[in-house]
């Protein structure tokens, strides 16, 4: 729900239609956050265009069926992350929100104080947070947790993320003898079995002193 009222749409010349079936069967272009229900998908006709966030790997069969019916489907999370497409990069914006929300939700369910509190009766230590993965969502989680007074640790297979984590006040956990597992496009690549074992050992030791894990 976008939070816009019907009158706001009417003011810019939009026609309000209450019958969902009419909209789906008559529209040439349909913008939808998630994939339509199975019943509504049956209402679509050839040469219509669907634009939205459709989780194509999960909904592969449904999308293939739409393609067979000559329906165009544009799943925005599959847009290439290139300069020309930056204004339509929904992954970064949604990942930012996901990182922020993960911290807020976890802190709301945490039964202790987040920042360190010093009183005459004693000191309450700050909560320790581990963020696994320092991509867009991870960096936002680190920044949010740090602003709220937590002690933040983070790990990532891409060594270039170390500087980003530390710039936000986080402590970067480095695997001994680690290599930079980053592709030319900035994504993480497959790690060796030896690296994975070292990473597991590092996390196993770290988790013993962590209050909240975000991954």
Language-model region placement:
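Glycine-rich phosphate/diphosphate-binding loop of Rossmann-like nucleotide-binding domains
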Residues: 1-4, 115-206
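An N-terminal-biased, well-structured beta-alpha scaffold segment characteristic
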Residues: 1-65, 69
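Residue-level detector of alpha-helix initiation sites
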Residues: 35, 97, 135-136
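Generic hydrophobic/aromatic pocket-lining and core-packing "Φ" positions
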Residues: 6, 41, 63, 103, ...
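Glycine/serine-rich phosphate-binding loop and adjoining beta1-alpha1 elements at the start
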Residues: 38, 42-128
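A structured beta-alpha segment of the ubiquitous adenosine-cofactor-binding alpha/beta core
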Residues: 11-28, 35-36, 183-213
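Hydrophobic beta-strand scaffold residues
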Residues: 16, 50, 73-74, 152, ...
């Amino acid at each position: 729900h976008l939070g816009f009222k019907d009158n706001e749409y009417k003011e810019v010349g939009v026609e309000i239609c209450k019958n969902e079936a009419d909209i789906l069967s008559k529209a040439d272009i349909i913008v939808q956050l998630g994939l339509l229900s199975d019943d509504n998908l049956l209402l679509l006709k050839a040469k219509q265009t669907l634009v939205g966030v459709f989780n194509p790997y999960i909904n592969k069969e449904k999308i293939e069926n739409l393609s067979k019916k000559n329906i165009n489907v544009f799943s925005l999370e599959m847009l290439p992350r290139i300069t020309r497409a930056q204004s339509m990069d929904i992954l970064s914006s949604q990942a930012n929100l996901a990182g922020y929300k993960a911290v807020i939700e976890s802190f709301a369910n945490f039964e202790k104080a987040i920042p360190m509190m010093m009183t005459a009766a004693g000191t309450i230590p700050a909560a320790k947070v581990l963020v696994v993965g320092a991509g867009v969502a991870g960096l936002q989680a680190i920044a949010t947790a740090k602003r709220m007074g937590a002690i933040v640790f983070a790990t990532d297979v891409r060594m270039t993320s170390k500087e980003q984590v530390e710039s936000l006040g986080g402590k970067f956990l480095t695997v001994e003898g680690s290599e930079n597992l980053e592709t030319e496009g900035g994504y993480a690549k497959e790690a060796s079995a030896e690296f994975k074992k070292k990473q597991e050992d590092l996390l196993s030791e770290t988790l013993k002193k962590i209050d909240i894990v975000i991954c």
